[in-house]
């Protein structure tokens, strides 16, 4: 019995060990303090609702209040850190919630909502995963972040430039000669470069279209696999990452005039069982529903409406042409036409 209790404890701790944290948020977006767990697949819905967009399914999570519907944030910045369930964030300024059922997610739905509603204003949309060399830039992000390092070779070269963080960060036990350490440091360099490049285009943070930033950091996870989570390198990297995230949150929050939401997701590891289950459903063979009787396809429900509109318009035009032609054919120029009548009167007067 005691063994079952211990196993259940570790199971619950592993399921709820990850965290979803709010680093910065404006007064118009209200996040309540509490220990309410948030499902991992509903994090995009939290980001969408905080920006004022609608979602397909209602979110019955008490952590997010209604807030000011007429004053929404100008930007949402979400940073996901892999390899750690939680970071030693300063208490008081950060609101954290347990994250349950941590599955891979993306903010594509939020990006699509921004594109559909603000297509003419070309907002900034940046989704970046430096360790996987994945980048997605749309709108004004192409011009603002065109000099941003996105490949592993570019990240390595950026670190050894004169104005890089490598010359100012306290590396402690980290080494600049190790590829894993350089990967972690290059992700911190990306955070610094994003805020630095945006500071050169401050007018983009003051327009009316909302912006979206989604960043995935896996350098700490690689350090844990290389040195171990109890190693000095992992502890030093965690402290450096916390300081870098705090500075990045302050910079982005300040650039948007205090009207931005900065969110952090820390995931030790994703629940592969849930991912595998969803994949088996998507990869299931589709049944052949084609009828062997060569039946006609089902027409659109609006077909009858369009058909009646076209039919009666054509009938009305045909009747108008027939009536007009009949009247012209039987018209008496002397009496039915005002042109000839006026001409005859004028002739009589003359």
Curated annotation (Swiss-Prot):
Description of post-translational modifications: Phosphorylated.
Record note on disruption phenotype: Conditional knockout mice lacking Atp6ap2 in glutamatergic neurons display increased spontaneous locomotor activity and altered fear memory; show abnormal number and morphology of synapses, presynaptic transmission and autophagy defects that lead to axonal and neuronal degeneration in the cortex and hippocampus. Conditional knockout mice lacking Atp6ap2 in the liver display liver damage, hypoglycosylation of serum proteins and autophagy defects. Conditional knockout mice lacking Atp6ap2 in cortical neurons die around 4 weeks of age.
Cellular location(s): Endoplasmic reticulum membrane; Lysosome membrane; Cytoplasmic vesicle, Autophagosome membrane; Cell projection, Dendritic spine membrane
Transmembrane region(s): 303-323
GO cellular component entries: autophagosome membrane; axon; clathrin-coated vesicle membrane; dendritic spine membrane; endoplasmic reticulum membrane; endosome membrane; external side of plasma membrane; lysosomal membrane
Topological region Extracellular: 18-302
Keyword Membrane: yes
GO biological processes: angiotensin maturation; central nervous system maturation; eye pigmentation; head morphogenesis; lysosomal lumen acidification; positive regulation of canonical Wnt signaling pathway; positive regulation of transforming growth factor beta1 production; positive regulation of Wnt signaling pathway
Extent of the signal sequence: 1-17
Expression sites by tissue: Expressed in glutamatergic and GABAergic neurons with highest levels in the cortex, the hippocampus, the medial habenular nucleus, the cerebellum, the medulla and the olfactory bulb (at protein level).
Subunit record text: Interacts with renin. Accessory component of the multisubunit proton-transporting vacuolar (V)-ATPase protein pump. Interacts (via N-terminus) with ATP6AP1 (via N-terminus). Interacts with ATP6V0D1; ATP6V0D1 is a V-ATPase complex subunit and the interaction promotes V-ATPase complex assembly. Interacts with TMEM9; TMEM9 is a V-ATPase assembly regulator and the interaction induces the interaction with ATP6V0D1. Interacts with VMA21 (via N-terminus); VMA21 is a V-ATPase accessory component.
Name of the featured protein: Renin receptor
């Amino acid at each position: 019995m005691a063994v079952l209790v211990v196993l259940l404890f570790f199971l619950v701790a592993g399921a709820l060990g990850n965290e979803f944290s709010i680093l910065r948020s404006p007064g118009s977006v209200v996040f309540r303090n509490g220990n309410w767990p948030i499902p991992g697949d509903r994090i995009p819905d939290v980001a969408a609702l905080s920006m004022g967009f609608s979602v397909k399914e209602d979110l019955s999570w008490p952590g997010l209040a209604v807030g000011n519907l007429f004053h929404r944030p100008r930007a949402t910045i979400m940073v996901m850190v892999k390899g750690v369930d939680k970071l030693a964030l300063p208490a008081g300024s950060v609101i954290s919630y347990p994250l349950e059922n941590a599955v891979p997610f993306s903010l594509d739905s939020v990006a699509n909502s921004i594109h559909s509603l603000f297509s003419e204003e070309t907002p900034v949309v940046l989704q970046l995963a430096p360790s996987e060399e994945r980048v997605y830039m749309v709108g004004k992000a192409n011009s603002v972040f065109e000099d941003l390092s996105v490949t592993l070779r570019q990240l390595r070269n950026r670190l050894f430039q004169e104005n890089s963080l490598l010359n100012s960060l306290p590396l402690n036990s980290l080494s600049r000669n190790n590829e894993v350490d350089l990967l972690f440091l290059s992700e911190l360099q990306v955070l610094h470069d994003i805020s630095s490049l945006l500071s050169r285009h401050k007018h983009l943070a003051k327009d009316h279209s909302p912006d979206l930033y989604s960043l995935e950091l896996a350098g700490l996870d690689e350090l844990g696999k290389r040195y171990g989570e109890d190693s000095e390198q992992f502890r030093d990297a965690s402290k450096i990452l916390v300081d870098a995230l705090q500075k990045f949150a302050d910079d982005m929050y300040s650039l948007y005039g205090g009207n931005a939401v900065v969110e952090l997701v820390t995931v030790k590891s994703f629940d592969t069982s849930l991912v595998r289950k969803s994949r088996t459903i998507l990869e299931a063979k589709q049944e052949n529903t084609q009828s062997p009787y060569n039946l006609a396809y089902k027409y659109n429900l609006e077909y009858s409406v369009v058909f009646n509109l076209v039919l009666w318009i054509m009938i009305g035009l045909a009747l108008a042409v027939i009536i007009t032609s009949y009247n012209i054919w039987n018209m008496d120029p002397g009496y039915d036409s005002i042109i000839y009548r006026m001409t005859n009167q004028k002739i009589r007067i003359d």
